[in-house]
């Protein structure tokens, strides 16, 4: 059903730096701060005539907070590189049509109301299975230069995204045929297929609306200057950017919510060393640190002037990706992996790993065991938790024809499905360097556990840019040059449909079409996922739980445990609320200071 026209493929190596930051909280920065140029001039802002000189009350003291991040954001356009730090500053300055609150409820931004079937804003053609979504925009939102935000800005943003030369794939954009402005405050999105994620498609964590009168369409969505010198619709304006040191944001006088933001100034300071940032937080020199790691949380738990906000559920799940195609191949049917193509081996690997032990010992108990994709609201499925049972794991390997007949402690193929007789059960367990020491320690423990059941496991650590680069660039996963990889992944928001497509749909196993890097092909799963593109929530729940059973039986990906989703902040700062649906600054306009 779903065929992605992903002209972003050429940019995949850049886009997938996402995992260096967004695949969980990384203890160390993925790379040195991005080499960028600070804006030569700030964007034009609306001017206000001075008031007549009269006796005025003494002004209130200017309030200011400091947010620490390890590297400069590449830009304010989080759709491009998605390092997390771009989304953090984007939330300070720019709005989309709608976002999500921590409970998963739609939070209107530029939109005046949420279009639904009940209010007539969503119209579905039951025969063609297409839909039209009509958005009504607020009439009181202006760009920071005083220009009203209109439906033309929404059309402009869409056309910039889908430009075949300078555009970028974003989730669900392949379902959109066109976007039309009916008037200044009404825009219609025409879908070629029912798309359940429409509510936050032009909003959420990664996408905002851009100004048609200010951004240069010739420069293109990925590279335009307005991505680094933005006009603001959000609560703050960019006042200064000293690359490698800090960014200064001040209140947006045109912000449409009266009395907000509650803090006059936000300074985003670049602090590459997380231990330095932790000390600054404890000493009161930093007010917010996004993505606090498990060791940092342990160190901060007794600090009297620091509080921790932890999301109610988890987003990032550490997982193993077993390649079902022979190493260097992308065809699991013609060239099955000699070891991992047998589901009994994949099941044995899961049984051999002590998830609780690793989570407690390495990740300080903050992570929780996860064994199904449907572990977080609103879609929960009852899948029994697998046991940690090395003896059962060894028995499965025996059954699969992997035995140790030469007595060296490592198994060889004796009647196995896909390897030659006598071939050793030897494979490589690979992870990425940027996560840091904790993940490498976890990798070592997993290697030891697999060795104990007779698997000869070699460990390797590579740069994420090598692991996740696109096919043309020789990305190890896209070209299939790996055995068993370890990294963390997850999705924002409340709709897992696109995430499931990218990770498990058969078409996504093709190079650069998605992240079905295990090359798992299952027509039954594909059919269920096709059916899930509906607005019938009860039916979607039923479909997802059927998918959960297939994933449990086939184990194309082995889920292990969640990593913590938490942010640390000073006790004087009120209103910080961590969420799996967005970055910590999602509600920055509501933050206040209590001295």
Protein language model annotation of sequence segments:
Residues 1-5:
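N-terminal secretory signal peptides that target proteins for export/translocation
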Residues 7, 11, 15, 19-59, ...:
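Extracytoplasmic/periplasmic ligand-capture domains
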Residues 66, 107, 132-134, 186-188, ...:
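General beta-strand recognition
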Residues 68-125, 231-233:
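N-terminal lobe/hinge region of extracytoplasmic solute-binding protein
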Residues 71, 433-435, 564:
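Residue-level signal for short, function-critical loop segments
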Residues 72-73, 140-142, 194-195:
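Acidic glycine-/aspartate-rich tracts in secreted/extracellular proteins
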Residues 170-218, 242:
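Surface-exposed binding/hinge segments that line
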Residues 560:
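Active-site-proximal polar cores
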């Amino acid at each position: 059903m779903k065929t992605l026209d992903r002209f972003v493929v050429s940019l995949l190596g850049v886009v997938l730096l996402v995992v260096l930051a967004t695949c969980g909280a990384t203890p160390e920065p993925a790379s040195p701060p991005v080499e960028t140029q600070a804006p030569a001039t700030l964007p034009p802002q609306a001017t206000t005539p001075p008031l007549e000189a009269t006796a005025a009350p003494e002004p209130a003291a200017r309030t200011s907070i400091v947010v620490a991040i390890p590297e400069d954001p590449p830009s304010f356009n989080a759709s491009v590189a998605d390092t997390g730090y771009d989304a953090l500053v984007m939330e300070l300055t720019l709005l989309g049509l709608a976002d999500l609150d921590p409970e998963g409820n739609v939070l209107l931004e530029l939109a005046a109301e949420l279009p639904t079937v009940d209010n007539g804003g969503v119209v579905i053609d039951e025969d063609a299975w297409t839909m039209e979504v009509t958005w009504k925009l607020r009439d009181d939102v202006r760009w920071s230069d005083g220009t009203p935000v209109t439906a033309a800005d929404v059309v402009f943003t869409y056309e910039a995204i889908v430009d075949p030369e300078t555009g970028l794939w974003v989730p669900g954009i392949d379902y959109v045929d066109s976007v039309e402005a009916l008037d200044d405050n009404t825009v219609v999105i025409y879908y070629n297929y029912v798309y359940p994620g429409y509510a936050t498609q032009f909003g959420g964590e990664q996408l905002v609306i851009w100004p048609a009168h200010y951004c240069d369409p010739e420069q293109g969505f990925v590279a335009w200057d307005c991505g680094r010198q933005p006009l603001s619709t959000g609560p703050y304006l960019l006042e200064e950017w000293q690359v490698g040191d800090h960014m200064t944001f001040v209140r947006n006088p045109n912000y449409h919510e009266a009395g907000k933001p509650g803090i006059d100034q936000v300074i985003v300071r670049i602090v590459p060393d997380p231990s330095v940032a932790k000390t600054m937080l404890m000493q009161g020199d930093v007010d917010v640190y996004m993505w606090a790691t498990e060791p940092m949380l342990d160190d901060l738990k007794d600090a009297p002037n620091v509080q921790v906000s932890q999301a109610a559920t988890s987003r990032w799940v550490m997982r193993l990706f077993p390649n079902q195609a022979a190493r260097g191949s992308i065809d699991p049917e013609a060239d099955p992996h000699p070891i991992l193509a047998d589901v009994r081996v994949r099941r044995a690997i899961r049984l051999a790993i002590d998830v609780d032990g690793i989570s407690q010992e390495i990740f300080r108990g903050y992570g929780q065991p996860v064994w199904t994709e449907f572990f977080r609201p609103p879609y929960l499925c009852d899948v029994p938790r697998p046991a940690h049972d090395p003896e059962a794991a060894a028995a499965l390997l025996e059954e699969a024809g992997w035995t140790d007949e030469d007595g060296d402690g490592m198994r060889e193929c004796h009647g196995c499905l896909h390897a030659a007789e006598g071939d050793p059960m030897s494979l490589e367990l690979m992870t990425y360097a940027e996560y840091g020491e904790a993940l490498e320690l976890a990798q070592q423990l997993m290697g030891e556990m697999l060795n104990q059941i007779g698997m000869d496991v070699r460990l390797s650590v590579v740069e994420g840019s090598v692991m996740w680069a696109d096919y043309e660039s020789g990305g190890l996963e896209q070209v299939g040059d790996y055995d068993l990889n370890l990294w963390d992944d997850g999705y924002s928001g409340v709709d897992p449909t696109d995430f499931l497509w990218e990770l498990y749909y058969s078409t996504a196993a093709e190079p650069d079409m998605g992240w079905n890097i295990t090359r798992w092909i299952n027509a039954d799963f594909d059919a269920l996922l096709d059916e899930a593109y509906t607005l019938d929530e009860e039916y979607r729940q039923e479909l997802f739980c059927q998918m959960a059973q297939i994933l449990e039986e086939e184990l194309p990906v082995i889920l292990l445990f969640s990593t913590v989703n938490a942010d640390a902040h000073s006790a004087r700062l009120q209103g910080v609320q961590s969420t799996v649906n967005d970055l910590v600054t999602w509600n920055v306009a509501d933050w206040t200071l209590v001295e």
